[in-house]
Amino acid sequence: MEVLYSLSKTLKDARDKIVEGTLYSNVSDLIQQFNQMIVTMNGNDFQTGGIGNLPIRNWTFDFGLLGTTLLNLDANYVENARTTIEYFIDFIDNVCIDEMSRESQRNGVAPQSEALRKLAGIKFKRINFNNSSEYIENWNLQNRRQRTGFVFHKPNIFPYSASFTLNRSQPMHDNLMGTMWLNAGSEIQVAGFDYSCAINAPANIQQFEHIVQLRRALTTATITLLPDAERFSFPRVINSADGATTWLFNPVILRPNNVEVEFLLNGQIINTYQARFGTIIARNFDTIRLSFQLMRPPNMTPAVNALFPQAQPFQHHATVGLTLRIESAVCESVLADANETLLANVTAVRQEYAIPVGPVFPPGMNWTELITNYSPSREDNLQRVFTVASIRSMLIK
């Protein structure tokens, strides 16, 4: 993997900097590095493809070295270099595609394609010019079963979940009380509602709670907490739990009371915030517990009082909500990130070449299913294919 990264970094620099008119002295170190790459690769044969619709291609390396010049690089020099650069880039692209198409239930973090396994050989170690990539560093640590640390912005840590629970229900569905939520990606939105606006609740207060367990622990997370859940702020028709009928949800938004968010790790509370909104920090957690209250307003204008009558029918439904959004966090496991294209790149390659469903990844790389059942085997394979995708993205946009 380190060799693949070094080849890609060298080729990217060569493509960007070996251009007509450049002073040789400005790129002499790069050209020496480029020549070292050629010397190491010459005389070797590789094969890629042969899975799904990915065609088999054979690669042979027999290239001349780039020479020295006293002045600027001329058109002939650059054209000669370009021929070599384009062949190498095509090779790296195909190695990456081949690697992203394969998976293994055992030691999935190790190279799976024939070409990348060959590049891992001792003869290619001299190509290791630059291993500064975060993904390469973490791949090395994971390969040695040591602790990794990926920094994510908008991590896709929450599997998609949209549902409701009813604490008070009846066949007519005209006086309900409960909680509904939408968890997805890096965001939780939860709303508590009471058609009667807590008129019969103790002290006219209804208590709500929403608990979310993460598939992997996060550390040093920057989080935004808001006293609102905009996705539950408009009327909707909802299917009943048994699917036999539908019921109306017509919210009128109130501000939640006594809001508390707890971040827990292995059942132990690590951080607690009460009535604090905006930016908050969570040190280390694998579970989030949100609790909040709906309080019937003790004083109401006639217009508000008309919204929340003392008895049925309840045409408007008192609702309070919260939004919790993870803005950035560190995770020991690799995750999809809304700010990166790695999952999209891997999925697109596997779809384009009709890669058959293997023993590890779900059909279509379904992220909700993948993260819901995030096994060590999936983690290993995902770290490998994401590392390869990050390498490929240097050369192929």
Curated annotation (Swiss-Prot):
The N-terminus is blocked. Sumoylated with SUMO1 and SUMO2. Sumoylation of viral proteins seems to have a positive role on viral replication. Zn(2+) binds at H153. Pfam families: Rota_Capsid_VP6 (PF00980). GO terms for molecular function: host cell surface receptor binding; metal ion binding; structural molecule activity. The keyword Zinc applies. Ca(2+) binds at N266, D286. Keywords: Calcium, Capsid protein, Intermediate capsid protein, Metal-binding, Ubl conjugation, Virion, Zinc. Residues 62-73 are annotated as: Interaction with the inner capsid protein VP2. It is found in: Virion. Its main location: virion. GO terms for biological process: fusion of virus membrane with host plasma membrane. Belongs to the rotavirus VP6 family. The VP6 trimer contains a zinc ion located at the center of the molecule. The zinc ion is not essential for either trimerization or transcription activity of the DLP. Zinc-depleted VP6 has an increased sensitivity to proteases. HAMAP family: Rota_VP6, Rota_VP6_A. Homotrimer. Interacts with the inner capsid protein VP2. Interacts with the outer capsid glycoprotein VP7. Interacts with the outer capsid protein VP5*. Intermediate capsid protein that self assembles to form an icosahedral capsid with a T=13 symmetry, which consists of 230 trimers of VP6, with channels at each of its five-fold vertices. This capsid constitutes the middle concentric layer of the viral mature particle. The innermost VP2 capsid and the intermediate VP6 capsid remain intact following cell entry to protect the dsRNA from degradation and to prevent unfavorable antiviral responses in the host cell during all the replication cycle of the virus. This is Intermediate capsid protein VP6.
